[in-house]
Amino acid sequence: MKLKKFAALLLAAVMTLSMAACTKEEGQAGGGEKEEEKDQLVLGTSADFAPYEFHKMVDGKDTILGFDVALAKKIAEEMDKELVIKDMDFNSLLNELNNGSVDFVAAGLSPDEERKKQVDFSDPYYFGEQCCIIRKEDAEKYTSLESFKDQQIAAQTGSIQEGIAKEQFPGSVLVSLPKLPDEIMSLSSGKVEGVIVEVAVANGFIAQNPDLMIADFEVPYDATGSCIAVKKGNTELLDHINSVIADVVASGEMDEMVNQANLDSEY
C-alpha cells in the first residue's frame, strides 16, 4: 500500500516537472518571435515634446499626436502591424527599449556617442535647430551664451540639451528636469533663467506662454538629426524603419507630417 502511494506521488512529480518544462519552452519561444510574427509594434515615447509628440483631446479622448507618432504609424502600417504607444519619462526610454518593454523609440532622439553604445539608430528623418527660451522681460539681459554665467538654465534629463548647456553656456548652472512643461513652469516662475530646447518645440510653448520668447542669439549645435532607436542588433526592424524613412523623406510626406503636427499642436 505504501509502495503504491509512493509510486503515485513520484508519477505526479514527474508530470508536474514535464509541464513546467513545456511551459518554459513555450514562453521562451513567444519572447523570441521575429518581427513578422508579431501582431503589434510597440512605440516608446515621451509625449511632452510638441510637435514631435504630445497629448491632445480629440473627440473627447486623450490622444497622442505628433510627427514622430505619424511616422511610427506609417512604419507599423507598412509592416502590417497594430501600433501600440507607451508614454513614459524621456530618461527611461532607452532602458525600456533594452529590457524589451518597447520595440522602438521615437522621441526627437539625436544619436550622440553615448546613446550609440546602448542602441542602434535609424537614418535621420528630421533636422532641427536649438535655441534658448527666456522671459520677454529679460530680452536685454540675456543677449549671448556668456550672459548666462552663474545663472540657472534648464534642460530635459537625459537629453541632448543637457550636453549643449554644459558645452555652450560657460559658467551656467545646469538644472535637469524630467518633463519639458516643468522646465517652462520653472522659467515662468523665475526658478531658472532659460530653457534649452529645439526651435520647433520652443514655438509651441511660446504660443501658449506669451510672456516667453526665444533669445536673440544662436545656440551652436552639430546637428545629427532626429533618428529612431531600436535594440542593438535588431537589423530586421531597422531595415523596415530605414525603408519607410527613405520613402517619406523623398516623397515629401515627412514635411506634410511635420506641418500637420504643427497645426495639431496649436491650441
Ranges and model annotations:
Residues 30-31, 135-153:
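Flexible hinge/capping segments at coil-to-helix
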Residues 47, 127-134, 199, 203-245, ...:
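Periplasmic-binding protein-like
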Residues 32-109:
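Extracytoplasmic small-molecule ligand-binding "clamshell" domains
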Residues 24-25, 69-78, 136, 152, ...:
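Extended ligand-binding regions for polar small-molecule ligands
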